[in-house]
């Protein structure tokens, strides 16, 4: 993904995590989900570099960060985020998170004590139960999937990711999402992160949602086929004062279906805390 450079490296538990910091102004942190990378913000983050100091990174085991054989679960990603916030010297940034990134920022806030000035959650993994039939099957057969022939992997990954996007995305636009999961290290990493999915990591934080200490807005694609919009409305009911905005004509990966809706929501929300 040469068009999405992450030029800086943070060492976490002996492994390399790639990140970028751009712009000047109040700190704004973007956190991606699975099976994606910080590339999901490529149509959104650049818009804010004239008004904010924008931070984004690839989770451990994802994108341009090290694809380790060890723990890349939700149980470690909040520890990584907490350490990164300290490395960046951020005490109370605005935070935007999608999918597993939502679980990560919620855990860092509620379990690691990290404070945010505001929090925007986009189709987050936050309420149990979660996990598609494909995820459940892979969890039971990780070794078999990790050893699939390359041509089958090249069919599975695009089909899986397309399920998160409502529009008919061209192959060249899909490629940056697919490429990190190809080849021996990438294929093993793809099934490793699925095999390590465990609902206990969301259960550990779920009961604490009423104690969230910052303003929250929740954005949800109306046509999300991975996590139904009803889960988003249920999440809103657990967080006092949370705003909820349904995004029309968008699936789970709202960043690809309706990036302008995310930008507009942030432009409405963030100035209240400037």
Regions found by a protein language model. Give the residues of each.
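Flexible "cap/lid" loop of the alpha/beta hydrolase fold
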Residues: 110, 116-148
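Conserved alpha/beta-hydrolase catalytic His-Asp/Glu region
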Residues: 130-132, 150-211
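Short alpha-helix in the alpha/beta-hydrolase fold that links the catalytic acid
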Residues: 173, 205, 228-237
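Conserved HGGG/HGGXW glycine-rich cap/lid loop of the alpha/beta-hydrolase fold
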Residues: 21-64
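Short beta-strand/loop motif that positions the catalytic acidic residue
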Residues: 212, 218-220
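Acidic catalytic loop of the alpha/beta-hydrolase fold
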Residues: 223-227
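Active-site loop/oxyanion-hole signature of alpha/beta-hydrolase fold enzymes
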Residues: 13, 55-97, 264-267
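Catalytic active-site module of serine/aspartate enzymes centered on a nucleophile-bearing elbow/loop
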Residues: 242-274
């Amino acid at each position: 993904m040469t068009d999405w450079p992450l030029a800086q490296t943070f060492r976490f538990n002996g492994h390399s995590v790639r990140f970028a910091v751009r712009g000047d102004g109040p700190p704004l942190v973007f956190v991606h989900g699975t099976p994606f990378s910080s590339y999901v913000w490529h149509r959104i983050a650049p818009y804010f570099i004239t008004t904010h100091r924008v931070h984004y990174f690839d989770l451990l085991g994802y994108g341009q960060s090290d694809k380790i054989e060890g723990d890349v679960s939700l149980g470690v990603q909040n520890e990584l985020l907490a350490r990164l916030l300290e490395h960046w010297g951020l005490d109370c940034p605005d935070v935007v998170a999608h999918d597993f990134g939502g679980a990560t920022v919620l855990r860092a806030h509620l379990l690691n004590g990290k404070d945010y000035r505001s929090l925007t959650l986009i189709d987050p993994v936050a309420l149990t139960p979660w996990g598609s039939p494909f995820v459940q099957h892979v969890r039971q057969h990780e070794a078999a999937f990790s050893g699939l022939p390359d041509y089958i992997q090249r069919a599975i990954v695009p089909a899986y990711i397309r399920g998160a996007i409502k529009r008919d995305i061209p192959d060249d636009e899909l490629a940056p999402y697919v490429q990190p999961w190809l080849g021996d290290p990438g294929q093993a990493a793809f099934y490793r992160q699925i095999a390590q999915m465990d609902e206990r990591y969301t259960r550990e934080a779920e009961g604490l949602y009423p104690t969230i200490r910052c303003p929250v807005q929740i954005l949800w694609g109306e046509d999300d086929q991975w996590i139904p919009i009803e889960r988003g409305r249920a999440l809103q009911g657990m967080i006092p004062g949370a705003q909820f905005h349904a995004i029309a004509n968008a699936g789970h990966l709202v960043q690809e279906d309706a990036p302008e809706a995310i930008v507009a929501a942030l432009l409405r929300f963030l100035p209240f805390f400037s």
